[in-house]
Amino acid sequence: MNATILVKIITPLSIALEKQAKMVTMSGEEGMFGVLPSHVPMIVSLKAGLVQVYIDDMHKSENTYLISSGVTEVTANYINIATETAINVTNFSEAEIATKLLDLQKTLSDQH
């Protein structure tokens, strides 16, 4: 499968990521889900967690971002992820990602 989908992770301050991908996985309010090219259109609320972007290999994530809650708009050709915070954790260890996630969840709970 050579088809790709454009994925953008957008924060109030910047576009954290803008790349063509073969697949993207993320944490919705109802659980983890994946998006492939030609996906049916949808809008989904996201919870704090990982967004994994698969560029060349659908079995190995090549870009991983930790996001705060947000919303994603999916069409057949693109995925827009709007979030307050996006941290590139591609080269972090699992322990470092877990620590960052706990810190982010604490910050979010302190705001509410």
From Swiss-Prot:
Gene giving rise to this polypeptide: atpC
Record's subcellular location: Cell membrane
CDD domains, A to Z: F1-ATPase_delta
Job description of the protein: Produces ATP from ADP in the presence of a proton gradient across the membrane.
Protein's membrane topology: Peripheral membrane protein
Record's GO cellular component terms: plasma membrane; proton-transporting ATP synthase complex
Keyword Phosphoprotein appears in the UniProt entry: no
Entry-linked Gene3D superfamilies: F0F1 ATP synthase delta/epsilon subunit, N-terminal
InterPro entries: ATP_synth_F1_dsu/esu (IPR001469), ATP_synth_F1_dsu/esu_N (IPR020546), ATPsynth_dsu/esu_N (IPR036771)
Identification of the protein by name: ATP synthase epsilon chain
Subunit structure: F-type ATPases have 2 components, CF(1) - the catalytic core - and CF(0) - the membrane proton channel. CF(1) has five subunits: alpha(3), beta(3), gamma(1), delta(1), epsilon(1). CF(0) has three main subunits: a, b and c.
Chief place where the protein resides: membrane
Cystine crosslinks: none
One of the Pfam families matching this protein, by short name: ATP-synt_DE_N
